[in-house]
Design a protein with these regions (language model features):
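Alpha-helical transmembrane segments in multi-pass integral membrane proteins
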Residues: 1-8, 14-29, 46-55, 105-111, ...
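Hydrophobic alpha-helical transmembrane segments of polytopic
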Residues: 8-15, 34, 40, 68-71, ...
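Short alpha-helix carrying the canonical HExxH Zn2+-binding catalytic motif
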Residues: 10-11, 119, 123-124, 255
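Structural signature of hydrophobic alpha-helical transmembrane segments
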Residues: 32-35, 118, 169-172
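Juxtamembrane transmembrane-helix termini
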Residues: 32-88, 233, 259, 263-264, ...
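Membrane-interface helix-loop-helix regions
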Residues: 40, 58, 64-126, 130, ...
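A short, conserved beta-to-alpha structural element at the edge of catalytic cores
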Residues: 93-99, 108, 149-164, 173-177, ...
Length: 317
């Protein structure tokens, strides 16, 4: 399987862009981008550990945590210094600590409410990273089957408790990582393991079928979108822009709400029910979010990643 999957990079960017459109008030469509992310994540975890599983968890923490921590601290700073700017975020040290350590919590009955609102998905990411890392340690050959087994067993266990953390990990959305694992095994023609993973996913889905509408409506279609993206990778033009967009998708996902809020304020000040200006503001919000995310990736996120990898991975590997 070709490790240069430009189709996957492009889909990653489009998934982030879909989440951006979901948070633009006048559009409000695109939350399925998160489901695409989760399927991609399961696939990439299998692909990235196909030859070497060592230091997997460290590598993923280095990739995910720095920018998330910076943006979370930024939001906390705003909540502390200018609380009127934010609607539902308090300058709570307890909330900050839970957010930085990827611990799910319920804020005033509003569901997932980390300091950086979009960070709820990263709680799921880190959860699966931990299970996958454990699976790599136990048996790297069957790491995918083991990881999905842990997820399904935990769905059964956590589903018996009413607390928010348990209900978070019993949510069928976690099975979307398993879809990515199954896709990798299918493309590797490992039919036995693929069928094992799909059987486990089916068992997990049946346990909480009535609450699993998101998994069925968006998770399964996301699987086919990821398959299409991988299949067409070699047919895409060899453009440096595609890896750049894919690389900046994480910054786009984390930071877009700030940019949208700025342009929303501008529209409120100047629009006077001017529909043309409102349409322009939507386009500017999209383009502005993309532009800022590319700058953040090139001049902040990527330099930090390179530095941490050199200091923490290359020296110990």
């Amino acid at each position: 399987m070709d490790n240069k999957l430009d189709g996957l990079e492009l889909l990653r960017f489009l998934a982030a862009l879909a989440v951006v459109t979901y948070h633009i008030p006048s559009i409000g469509i695109g939350h399925f981008g998160v489901d695409i992310f989760f399927v991609i994540s399961g696939f990439v975890m299998m692909l990235s550990t196909s030859n070497n599983t060592s230091q997997f968890l460290l590598k993923r923490v280095i990739r995910i945590a720095p920018l998330y921590w910076l943006t979370t601290l930024g939001v906390f700073g705003i909540a502390l210094l200018a609380p009127s700017v934010l609607k539902s975020t308090d300058a709570s040290i307890i909330d900050l600590t839970k957010s930085l350590f990827f611990i799910p919590f319920d804020k005033n009955g509003a569901g997932h409410q980390p300091v950086l609102a979009v960070g709820w998905t990263l709680n799921y990411e880190m959860y699966f990273y931990a299970l996958f890392a454990l699976s790599c340690l136990l048996c790297s050959r069957f790491r995918g089957v083991l990881a999905v087994s842990f997820i399904v067993v935990n769905i059964f266990i956590q589903g018996n408790f009413d607390n928010f953390v348990s209900q978070t990990y019993a949510n069928l959305i976690v099975l979307e990582f398993g879809l990515g694992v199954a896709l990798y095994l299918m493309l590797k023609k490992d039919i036995f393991q693929m069928l094992a993973v799909l059987s486990l996913i089916g068992i997990g889905a049946l346990f909480n079928f009535e609450e699993g509408h998101r998994f069925f409506l968006f998770g399964l279609p996301s699987l086919f979108l990821v398959l299409i993206a991988i299949s067409y990778s070699n047919r895409l033009p060899n453009l440096s822009l595609i890896p750049l967009l894919g690389g900046s998708s994480y910054a786009l996902y984390l930071c877009h709400t700030f940019i949208i809020r700025v342009f929303d304020r501008l529209v409120d000040w100047f629009s006077n029910e001017n529909s043309l200006l409102e349409v322009s503001a939507v386009l500017i919000s999209l383009l502005g979010s993309i532009g800022v995310s590319i700058l953040l990736f090139k001049y902040l996120e990527n330099p930090i990643l390179i530095y941490l990898r050199q200091k923490l991975i290359n020296k110990t590997h």
